[in-house]
C-alpha cells in the first residue's frame, strides 16, 4: 500500500511538472511567428534514466522559432550551458485519431511517413549538476530543449535498420562518441510509440506534418564557442554547423 501511495505521489508531482511546461508553452506561443512543430522525447537511454532517477522518458515541445533546416552557424550568445545530441526524427503522416489508442508497434507503419537526421541542442539553465537538477525540473522547462536542427532529406523507415544503426558525433573533426539507435529504447520507434500513446492518454493528438525527435543516439556533449560540430548518420546524411 505504501508503494502504491508513493507511485501516486510521484505521478501527481510529474503531472504538476507537465502543467508548468504547458504554461511555458503558452508563453512560447505568444512570440511572433512561433508555433509548435512537434515533440521531443528525452531520457531514452538506460544511462540517462539512471542519472535522472526515473524509469520512463519525458517529452517536450519543438517550436518553429527555435528550429532550423541545416543551419550553418549557431550563436553562443543565445545559450547558457548547451549540449548537442544527434537524434533520429520522424514525421507524422496524418492527424492521429487518438480514439484508436493505445497503438501498437505495427501501427507506426501508417502513423509515420518517414525519418530524417536531426540534432537537438539541450540547455540546462540551472547552476547545478544534472543529477541534482532532477527530471521534474527538466520536464517543467520544456525537457531542456533549446534548439533543433533537421535535415530535409526524408527517408523511408523500412530502408533503415533502426535496431542497430551507428551514429557518430564529431567536435572539431574529432570523433567524441560513436552511438547507436539501439541506445534509444532499443529502437527509436519505441520512443515514438511511447510518446504517441502517452499524449493520447492526455487527449492530445499529433497532427499531420508534425515531427518527433526521438532521443539521442550518443552521449550528450557540452559544446563551447569556436567549435565545429558534425553529427554523422552514415548513409542517411549528416548535420554540420559552427558554434560561434
Regions found by a protein language model. Give the residues of each.
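Single conserved hydrophobic/aromatic residue that forms the stacking wall/gate
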Residues: 1-13
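Glycine-enriched loop-and-adjacent helix/strand subsegments that border the catalytic/binding cleft
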Residues: 18-22, 27-189
